[in-house]
Amino acid sequence: FHYSVDYRIGTRYMGEYIADNFKREAMRVPLLRELLMTDSVYIASNITFDNLAPLSTYLGRPGDPAKGGLPFGEYMKRQDQHRQAEIAAMLDAKRFIDRASDLYGYANFVCDTSGSICEVVDPDNPDDPVLTCLAEQLLMVWIKGSDAHTAELVRRFDRAPKPMYYQPDFLHAMWQDYRSTHSVTDETCDPDHFVRWTYARALAHRQPRYGAMARWGVTVTAEEVARVTSPAVFDDLMVQAIDRKAATD
């Protein structure tokens, strides 16, 4: 059973926010406004495991409204909505483990977390509610990338920047630094350039947090995962990771 935390966020917890944002835009068009007001059309998100664009679009980017930017206050409000949704979605994992077993008879379960999980937990707190819940039900696995993988992620993001969730303190610092170093205001900031500029710094910010989270589980490398060709090979890799962890504890 594949439990996608991002999909759960975009459907169960932020689905109404996303749909309302679509409707807000549609209400600016006279024809669509009339149809909406008479319940003649239905507007909804078609988010899927493979297409999370409705969620990313709703999160948005701060900056110049003429370039699709949001006021920084509205941007931070949506960031906080995502934070609460992400925590709730991860705490739902236990219920979906039971559901997968009871409904479908699945003995195996994969919890596909969001990359921003490190932004909403405190790995140095032994009582962190989210990590405690996950550790009791799942084997947490960190797929550790190399510098080359990081560089490739940055290149991909530069080609197609997308909104993401970050810690409030980090975002405030980036927003202040960007405006001062680029001599722009909240209203003149280029939204895409800001998120591109922030992304590489965000990856560096996240690495030590992922490393600290790894103490709650095991670590495998991206190269090891790339060599997985079957369930049996995957199982063997997990055994190796557990053995490595036991040898260093």
Name each model-derived stretch.
Residues 11-12, 118-120, 148-154:
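Switch/connector loops and helix/strand junctions flanking conserved nucleotide-binding motifs
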Residues 63-76, 160-194:
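A solvent-exposed, charged loop/short amphipathic helix patch at secondary-structure junctions
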Residues 112-113, 130-180:
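Conserved phosphate-donor/acceptor-positioning beta-strand/loop module used by diverse small-molecule
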Residues 123-129:
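Charged helix-capping and loop-helix junction motifs
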Residues 183-249:
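NTP-dependent small-molecule kinase module
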